[in-house]
Amino acid sequence: MKLLVKAPAKINLSLDVLGKRQDGYHEVKMIMTTIDLADRLELMELAEDRIEILSHNRYVPDDQRNLAYQAAKLLKEKFNVKKGVSITIEKTIPVAAGLAGGSSDAAATLRGLNKLWNLGLTIDQLAELGAEIGSDVSFCVYGGTAIATGRGEQIEHIKTPPSCWVILAKPHIGVSTADVYGNLKLNRVTHPNVDKMVDVINAGDYKGICDTVGNVLEDVTFAMHPEVARIKAQMKRFGADAVLMSGSGPTVFGLVHHDSRMHRIYNGLKGFCEQVYAVRLLGERETLE
């Protein structure tokens, strides 16, 4: 038996870091929403007791460094599953881009194997298991639009923002999340107003959302990688309604309401950035079939 599962990317509309925790993680407060850029996973049951990861993308690890592998291993161990699984990952989300591609693959694996192996877990139980794999996995299990607190695993759902275009541009560099957090000086950065963002989203106020986007990690990543700041400036110059870096970078996204402007910005960015995408904001929650 085999199953196809979608794994959508996320962007942060607001991301704040409140401090460092005793467990070494950082306390965060952020708003994430899913977008219509997704990896596709094919899960195929194996008679042998093993986990196999397949992908044409050479940047996707095929061992336990892969979060989808970790998700399958976790379910096998927790629920004493003796069957195996082959997971084929068709990557569309750029790797190491600040878009939670790996976390979303893990979340899709949890949802898919729950069905394939007839585990009968609720979406809340899957999200709880996701937190054992990575900070963004819980959110990715649910999808939709939510405030994430703690280290990112405590999820509170809010309304879906008004529909718009999301233009993504990823420079050809990698950003180490650990280095970004390591260089973060909380008293020297601009903290976004996360609570105000919740209010404007719940009010369906598109202009308010555009005026309130913010990411406390931007200044740090910009100092380490000035080309990310240049992409943000260029996207603003082309006329996006709001521009922000997602996660710890290096991907920058712009929100755009009008189709004609979206095409202009997309074509303009293609001139000097290798990976550019124009997708819709999804913001809808996942359901278990």
Swiss-Prot record:
Residues that, per the record, bind ATP:
94-104
- EC number of the protein: 2.7.1.148
Q: In which pathway does it act?
A: Isoprenoid biosynthesis; isopentenyl diphosphate biosynthesis via DXP pathway; isopentenyl diphosphate from 1-deoxy-D-xylulose 5-phosphate: step 3/6
Instruction: For this UniProt record, give its keywords in alphabetical order, as a comma-separated list.
Output: ATP-binding, Isoprene biosynthesis, Kinase, Nucleotide-binding, Transferase
The UniProt entry annotates the active site at: 10, 136
Q: Name one GO molecular function term.
A: ATP binding
Stretches that traverse the bilayer: none
Reactions that this protein is recorded to catalyse: 4-CDP-2-C-methyl-D-erythritol + ATP = 4-CDP-2-C-methyl-D-erythritol 2-phosphate + ADP + H(+)
Q: Which Pfam families match?
A: GHMP_kinases_C, GHMP_kinases_N
Q: A Gene Ontology biological process annotation?
A: terpenoid biosynthetic process
Role, per record: Catalyzes the phosphorylation of the position 2 hydroxy group of 4-diphosphocytidyl-2C-methyl-D-erythritol.
Q: Which HAMAP family match?
A: IspE
- Family statement: Belongs to the GHMP kinase family. IspE subfamily.
Put simply, this protein is called 4-diphosphocytidyl-2-C-methyl-D-erythritol kinase
Species this protein is from: Bacillus cereus (strain AH187)
**Record lineage:** Bacteria, Bacillati, Bacillota, Bacilli, Bacillales
